[in-house]
Structure formats: C-alpha cells, structure tokens
C-alpha cells in the first residue's frame, strides 16, 4: 500500500510538473499571440486610414485622377507578389520542399490553383471601385456608410461559412442599416470636394511621343461629333446618377464585393491542408491572379492601352499616388494576415476604428460640415456595432477552429520552419474527443 501511495505521489508530482511546464509555454504563446494581434490591428488601422487620405490627396483640382487608377492597383499587386515570392522561396529552402509547391504539377493541383482566381477578381473590383467612391463622396461619409459591410459579412457568414448569429446581433444589424440610411439622407455636405493646395506636380516628365499622342488624341476628340454627343450624354447620365446617389450605389456594391472576397479568401486559406500551409505561398498564388486581372484592364481598354504604351505606366502619377501604391500593398498583406490568423469579424471590428479616425480627420482636412443628423446618427452606428460584437453566440465549430489556430497565432513568424507538429497533435486530440462523444 505504501508502494502504491508512493507511486501515486510520484506520478502526481510528475503530472503537476509537466502541467506547469506546459502552462509556461502556453502563457508565452498567448502573450505572443496578443502582441501579434495588437500589431495587426494597429497596422491595419494605420494603413486603412492612410489609404483613404492618399486617395483624396492624389486627385487633381477637379476631384479627378490624372493617372489611371488601375495602374496603382497593378503597382500594389506587383509589390505584394514580389514580397510573397521572396518569402516563399525562403520558406521552401528552410523546409527543404520542392519549388513545385509554387506552381501546379497535376490537373488536381491546377484546379486547386484556380480557386485563388475568385478572390483575386473580387479584390480587383473592390480596389477599383474605391477610387470612384472617394471621387463622389466625402471620406467621412464613405467610411461611415461602408459599415454596412458588417451586414453583408454577417449575411454571407450565415450562408457561406454557416456561422450562427444571435437574435440580438440580427437586431443590431437592422439598427445599423437604418442608421446608415438615415445618415445618407441627411442635409449635410456629403459630396466630395477637391483638396486645395495639396496637388503636387507629376513625378515624371512626358516624353515627346507622349506629348504628340495626347495632342493628337485631343484634336481627334475635338473634331469627333460622336465623341462630344457621347460625352454630353455621359455627363447628363452621371449628373442624374449623382443626384440619385451614385456614390452610395457604388459603395453598397463595394461592401458586398469586399465581404464576399474576404469570406471566400478566409475559407480557402483555412480549409483542409491549407490551414498549416505558409501564408506566403498561398498569397503568391492570389497575387499572381491579381496581377493578371489588373494588367488586363490596361491591355483591353483601348485608351488605357495606347496611353500606357506612349506615356508609360507612371503617366500622371504624383508623390501621393505612388505612396498610395505601397500603402495599398501593405494593407492587402495585413488583411491576408488577419484572415489567416484571425477572422473576418476581427477585420470588420478594426475597420470601425478606421471609421472614427477618418471621420475625425475629415473635420480638419476636408472641410467636412456635417448636419445635426450626423451627430445624432453616428453614435447610433457605433453603438449598434458595439452591441453586435458584445452579444456573440457560441459556435462550437468556430471555437474549435480558433483553438487550432491559437498555436499558429502565437508562432506566426517562428512557424516558417513548417513543422506544424503542435497543430497536428491538437487536431488529433480534438478528433479523438469528437469520436468518443459520438460513440457515447
């Protein structure tokens, strides 16, 4: 009996010591995960705010763009692709893997590769629409109205990812929608105004062939009656659409496209074997398609193609537009990390901080003069967002996925070796517990 007690005490002490040993790395991982989460959130808010401001500053006196918006997106996609390819090569060399992982060596891998074309095309549309949204609306109204992305994200969460929402969350979404509609029908100065005094010169001087082409193009347009009739019809149509609220229609379309792109991207980032795959290898495939789609815009449009061939891709660009390309690239990378190691709701929540920052800056930078309705309805928008996030419904499947991702969150940068043993052990343990419950 004494032998039994001694064995029990020794096993208990060893178990307690092992549990303490497990707690220490766990707490270290959790603190590291919190630090990475805070860094992701701050980076996303800073980059999101900078992007909105640069979009506004890069316009001309007529609140239009001297450069082609597609060229900015093409520049951003190229920067992201080069960065992810360099990091992917680093990961492959460290893990001793084959470079075939960056391509497609079979029919099945080719079909899997094509999955990344869907979010790439949606992001292409999203990044293109935002230029015209900022041209039609004040930045403060644009970011406030873009909160409707919470509604579209929640709807797609339920349909695509089968996520559950409580009745309180649905009620808060309805309040959010009605508040945003009330904001858009207010009497404040909601339409965009050009920023005076912040229009720097172009970074490149047009060549002789460029000047000759633009001059001939203007002469051709001035003698083309069909062009003027088409321009008159377009201006009348745009005026009618603007009075109808074209900026809000475009922003509503962008909210749906953005939510769909982020949800589909999160789905393929985390499904099956992709959960433990390097984010740089995954994003290399995504940004390759993004580069193709943005290149097609410049190639298929006759005016864009001729202007790019004669004047170059940097024609009309200024310091703000070039900075916009780098900020857009960094913002896209931060969104990818959020979708991989957090989720869409964290992405949407941090976006609300961007809303507050941009709205505050609009008072000082863009002469934003809101009506009394704005001050009454804006707090309701933020309050409904708070109610939505404070009344989350427990979803066992989502909690299980977050538990599996917790190890990756804590070792987001150390994980480049790609062993993934802890994740496999955790997955195996969860699978065994599920099978025991089913048998019971």
From Swiss-Prot:
UniProt keyword terms in alphabetical order: Antiport, Glycoprotein, Golgi apparatus, Membrane, Sugar transport, Transmembrane, Transmembrane helix, Transport
Signal peptide: none
Bias kind Low complexity: ranges: 9-19
Catalytically driven reaction(s): UMP(out) + UDP-alpha-D-glucuronate(in) = UMP(in) + UDP-alpha-D-glucuronate(out); UMP(out) + UDP-N-acetyl-alpha-D-glucosamine(in) = UMP(in) + UDP-N-acetyl-alpha-D-glucosamine(out); UDP-N-acetyl-alpha-D-galactosamine(in) + UMP(out) = UDP-N-acetyl-alpha-D-galactosamine(out) + UMP(in)
One Pfam family this sequence matches: Nuc_sug_transp
A GO-annotated cellular component: Golgi membrane
Keyword Nucleotide-binding set for record: no
Protein name in the entry: UDP-sugar transporter protein SLC35A5
The species this protein was found in: Danio rerio
Gene behind the chain: slc35a5
């Amino acid at each position: 009996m004494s032998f039994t007690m001694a064995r029990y005490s020794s096993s208990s002490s060893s178990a307690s010591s092992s549990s303490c040993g497990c707690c220490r790395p766990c707490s270290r991982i959790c603190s590291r995960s919190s630090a990475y989460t805070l860094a992701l959130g701050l980076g996303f808010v800073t980059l999101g705010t900078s992007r909105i401001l640069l979009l506004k500053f890069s316009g001309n006196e007529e609140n239009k763009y001297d450069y082609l918006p597609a060229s900015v997106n093409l520049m951003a996609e190229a920067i992201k692709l080069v960065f992810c390819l360099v990091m992917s090569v680093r990961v492959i060399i460290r893990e001793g893997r084959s470079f075939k992982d960056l391509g497609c060596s079979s029919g099945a891998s080719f079909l899997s590769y094509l999955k990344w074309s869907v979010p790439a095309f949606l992001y292409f549309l999203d990044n293109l629409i935002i230029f015209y949204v900022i041209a039609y609306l004040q930045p403060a109204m644009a970011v406030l109205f873009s909160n409707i992305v919470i509604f579209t994200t929640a709807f797609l969460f339920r349909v695509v990812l089968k996520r559950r929402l409580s009745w309180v969350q649905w009620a808060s979404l309805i309040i959010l929608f009605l508040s945003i509609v009330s904001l858009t029908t207010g009497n404040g100065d909601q339409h965009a105004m050009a920023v005076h005094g912040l229009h720097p010169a172009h970074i490149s001087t047009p060549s002789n062939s460029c000047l000759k082409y633009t001059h001939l193009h203007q002469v051709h347009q001035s003698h083309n009656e069909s062009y003027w009739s088409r321009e008159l019809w377009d201006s009348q149509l745009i005026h009618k659409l603007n009075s109808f609220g074209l900026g809000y229609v475009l922003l509503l379309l962008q909210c749906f496209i953005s939510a769909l792109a982020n949800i589909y991207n999160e789905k393929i980032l985390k499904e099956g074997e992709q959960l433990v795959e390097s984010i740089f290898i995954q994003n290399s495939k995504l940004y390759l398609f993004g580069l193709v789609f943005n290149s097609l815009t410049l190639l298929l449009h006759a005016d864009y193609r001729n202007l790019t061939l004669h004047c170059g891709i940097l024609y009309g660009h200024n310091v703000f537009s070039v900075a916009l390309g780098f900020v857009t690239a960094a913002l896209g990378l931060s969104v990818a990390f959020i979708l991989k190691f957090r989720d869409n709701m964290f992405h949407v929540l941090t976006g609300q901080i961007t809303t507050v920052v941009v709205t505050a800056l609009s008072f000082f930078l863009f002469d934003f003069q809101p009506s009394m309705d704005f001050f009454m309805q804006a707090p309701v928008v933020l309050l409904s967002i708070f109610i939505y996030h404070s009344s989350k419904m427990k979803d066992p499947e989502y909690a299980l996925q977050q538990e599996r991702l917790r190890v990756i969150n804590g070792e987001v940068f150390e994980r480049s070796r790609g062993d993934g043993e802890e994740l496999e052990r955790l997955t195996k343990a969860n699978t065994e517990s599920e099978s025991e419950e089913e048998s019971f």
